[in-house]
Structure formats: C-alpha cells, structure tokens
Amino acid sequence: MVLIRVLANLLILQLSYAQRTSELVIGGDECNINEHRFLVALHDALSGRFLCGGTLIHPEWVLTAAHCNTHFIIIYLGAHNQSVEFDYEETRYPEKKYFFPCSKNYTKWDKDIMLIRLYSPVRNSKHIAPISLPSSPPSVGSVCRIMGWGAITSPNETFPDVPHCANINLFNYTVCRAAYPELPATSRTLCAGILEGGIDTCHGDSGGPLICNGQFQGIVQAGGKTCARPRKPAVYTNVFDHLDWIKSIIAGNTAVTCPP
C-alpha cells in the first residue's frame, strides 16, 4: 500500500512538472491545422527565406506589419507545415503595398502596419478563409490568441515547421510603458502577454494576428532580443484604430486623409 502511494505521488509530480514545462514553450502548442485559415506566410521571393506572418482580411487583401516589407515578397496561403507543400496551398504576389501615411498624433509604433493587395483574389476553401475586421475595440483583460511560425525557444532560437498557438492577456498600455521606457507616454498600440513570462510571440511571428475574443485586434510588432521574459509583454499594432484607413484603401480611395 505504501509503495502504491509513493508511485502515485511520483506520477502526480511528473504530470505537474510536464504541465509547467509545456507552458514555457514560446508560442504555446502546435496550432490545429484548421484553426488558422486566415494566417499567411510571407517569404522573400528571391531567397525563399521566411520573413513574417500576415492575416488574410479579404479575398484580395492581406494585413501585416510595415517592418516586414522587402522588395520582392511571395505570400503563401493555406500553409501549415513549411517543410511540406500541399496541393491546397496557394501562392500570391503583391500587386501593391500600402503604408499608413499619417504622422500627426501617430508614432512609429502606431504605424507599423502594411496593407497588401494580392495580384489575384483567393477563393475560400477548407484551409483558406479571411477573418473579419473588428467591429469594436478590444477590452483590457481580454484573452487573446497568438499564432505564427516564430521562434519557440529564446534566446537560443529554434523555429518550428508548423505554426504554434497560445493564449495571452490584454493589458493596459501602461504595463508595456513600464516594461519599455523608450515607448512614448501615449500610444495607439496594444499591450499583451503573460506577466509571469514563458509564453510570447517571438522573432518570426512579426506581422501575424492577435485575436481577442474572436476578433482580429492586433498585429505583432518586432520584439526585443529575448522573448517571453517575466513582466515583459509585447506591443501590437492596434487594428481597430486603423479601420477607416483600411476600409478606404480596400474601397479604392487611395488618397485617404489622416484621422484626427
């Protein structure tokens, strides 16, 4: 009987340790293959090198981070395992790229956004479908979903073949301001992460989505040298604050005026 109790306690300890260590994987667990139909992968068309993630918001439009731009981009839609190409995957080249033009009341962090018009639209399929733009702003305290092919260890980085997904929390901007004093006193960006550390977006996740309560609210910005540190949440471009610009460009008004 004593031996059984000892073995049972050892099993509990082992399971507890396994749970804690799995929580420390940057980016969480492997995404379900049907969970990220809107997630796209941006590659350098010349070298084939993976650059960033992005989000399909319309059959003809992708939203990503401005710092992901390079001269020649190829976009993979419906991708899951980057080492294996499947018949259902599609590729597109940009027809045109749009960058947020406003300077007044917008810092460089606020403007890390790029809208890409695809050379030709894609059709919805089992593995490809756009996500809607947000209908309301995100609320502090929301649980948000992150996903991407970024590093799953840091600072010694390893990159997965398949995207990883995880849940994080949305904080008040002051939390990121305290973590990164170089940030401006006020900003239109979002602040999200896990205060205890261990789960975070990392290098390679840039441009990918932040999904809060089922709505596409943020775009991953470039992070620091080390990811998933305690009390070091990440900064995301606020999609809702750019809705008028995004919708105007998609509607064909490329000479949009800056919001106040």
Swiss-Prot record:
One Gene Ontology MF term: serine-type endopeptidase activity
GO cellular component: extracellular region; secretory granule
PROSITE patterns (UniProt xref): TRYPSIN_DOM (PS50240), TRYPSIN_HIS (PS00134), TRYPSIN_SER (PS00135)
Residues excised as propeptide: 19-24
UniProt-listed PANTHER family: KALLIKREIN-1, KALLIKREIN-RELATED
Glycosylation sites: N81, N105, N156, N172
Subcellular localization: Secreted
SMART domains: Tryp_SPc
Pfam families in the record: Trypsin (PF00089)
Name used for this protein in its record: Snake venom serine protease serpentokallikrein-1
Classification lineage: Eukaryota, Metazoa, Chordata, Craniata, Vertebrata
Biological role stated in the UniProt entry: Snake venom serine protease that may act in the hemostasis system of the prey.
InterPro entries, A to Z: Peptidase_S1_PA, Peptidase_S1_PA_chymotrypsin, Peptidase_S1A, Trypsin_dom, TRYPSIN_HIS, TRYPSIN_SER
Tissue expression as described in the entry: Expressed by the venom gland.
Disulphide bonds in the chain: C31-C165, C52-C68, C102-C258, C144-C212, C176-C191, C202-C227
Enzyme class: hydrolase
Stretches assigned to the Peptidase S1 domain: 25-251
Signal peptide segment: 1-18
Active site (record annotation): H67 (charge relay system), D112 (charge relay system), S206 (charge relay system)
One annotated GO biological process: proteolysis
UniProt keyword annotations, A-Z: Disulfide bond, Glycoprotein, Hemostasis impairing toxin, Hydrolase, Protease, Secreted, Serine protease, Signal, Toxin, Zymogen
